[in-house]
Every structure is written in C-alpha cells, then in structure tokens.
Regions:
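N-terminal membrane-anchoring alpha-helices
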Residues: 1-47, 206
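A structural signal for short, hydrophobic/glycine-enriched beta-strand patches
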Residues: 31, 35-189
Length: 206
C-alpha cells in the first residue's frame, strides 16, 4: 500500500513538472510573439489611422503619446488614410481627455478638424478597441491602421480580430519606451500575459 502511494505521488509530481515546463514554454512563446509582432509594420492604405491613447498632462501629450501622434502624422502625410481616430478618455484627476489633447496636437500640426474623430470616453485598451469597432461600423470603414507602442501591438491586433475589425499594425519607432531596457522588458512581460487574456477573457486584460 505504501509503495502504491509513493508511486502515485511520483506520477503526480512528474505530471505537475511537465505541466510547469509546458506553461514556461508557452509563456516564452508569448513573450517572443509580443516582441516579433511589435517589430512588424504592416501599415497599408486604410480608412482610418487609430492612435491609441496614453497619458497627457494638462492638455499636453506625454512623450509616449506624442511619439504615437508623430508616427500617425507621418502615415497621414503619406496618404495611408484620410482620417485620424484619436482615442482615450479622462483618467482620475485629469482636466481634459487623452483624445482631446491628441486632437489639439494634431490640429497644431496641420490636420484639419474634419479629418479627426475623437473618442474620449474609454479608459482602457479594451474600451478603446470596442469604441474603435463601433466607430468603424458606424462609418462603414473597411479597415484601420493601429498606432501604438511596440509592446502593445499583439494585444491590439488580437482584440481587433476578435471584434471583427480588419486592422494593420504600425508601431511607433520613437517611443521613449524601448523594449530592451528595464521598463520595456516589464511592459513586454506584462503584455505576454495580457495578450492571451484579451483574446480569451477580454475584460480581464484591461
């Protein structure tokens, strides 16, 4: 009897060990996917360029948000799309929304108001993508180009696919968040968990 219990315990530990190894391998694959997708720019002619919201300070875009806007402006100037969708609501304590800050920046840089759509209610990536999907359906847009940081792209594209939005990724190359430094690595590791959650559970990856 004791021998049987030891045998059963041994098999259980082996199964747990294999499961742990499998989880580590899968997590490693997700980390690699975040990095690989983040380095692919698949921008092509579309109906709109979407700028994902980020922090702003008193109406002034943060360096992260400004890098996204700079990149979107270059795409707009190349004729990738004639419309900018600027996303992001007010975070706690803000006097203005991320989208409104982005819109002011875009107008100062020559984008006419008629080419700008402001989405200023969302407060998370999930909410932003749902808002983009609603706008795309209402405007009968066939496709959009998503602009954000490299670490963000896999989750955005998975969410877009789940929401039946045809989307192309175009990560900014000038963000102060660099994937190879400590801050960038933290973002990559976080996204390696958030991306599959966004696909499987959606709201859990906010």
């Amino acid at each position: 009897m004791a021998r049987q219990r030891r045998s059963l315990t041994g098999r259980l530990f082996r199964l747990l060990g294999r499961a742990l190894i499998l989880l580590v391998v899968l997590w490693g694959a997700m980390v690699a996917a975040v990095v690989i997708v983040g380095h692919r720019d698949t921008a092509r002619t579309a109906d709109a360029i979407v700028v994902m919201g980020a922090a702003q300070y008193g109406g002034r875009p943060s360096p992260v948000l400004e890098a996204r806007l700079d990149h979107a402006l270059r795409l707009y100037g190349r004729g990738v799309a004639k419309t900018l969708i600027l996303t992001g609501g007010r975070q706690h304590g803000d006097i203005t929304s991320e989208a409104e800050s982005s819109a002011r920046w875009a107008r100062r840089h020559g984008v006419p108001k008629s080419d700008i759509i402001i989405e200023n209610e969302s407060r998370s990536t999930t909410e932003q993508m749902h808002a983009v999907a609603r706008i795309a359906r209402a405007r009968k847009f066939d496709s959009v180009v998503l602009v954000s940081d490299r670490f963000h792209m896999l989750r955005l594209l998975l969410t877009a696919w789940k929401l039946n939005v045809t989307a192309y990724g175009s990560p900014t190359r000038s963000s102060p968040i660099v994937l190879t430094d400590a801050e960038g690595i933290r973002y990559v590791l976080a996204e390696s968990l958030k991306a599959p959650l966004a696909f499987l559970l959606e709201d859990a990856a906010r």
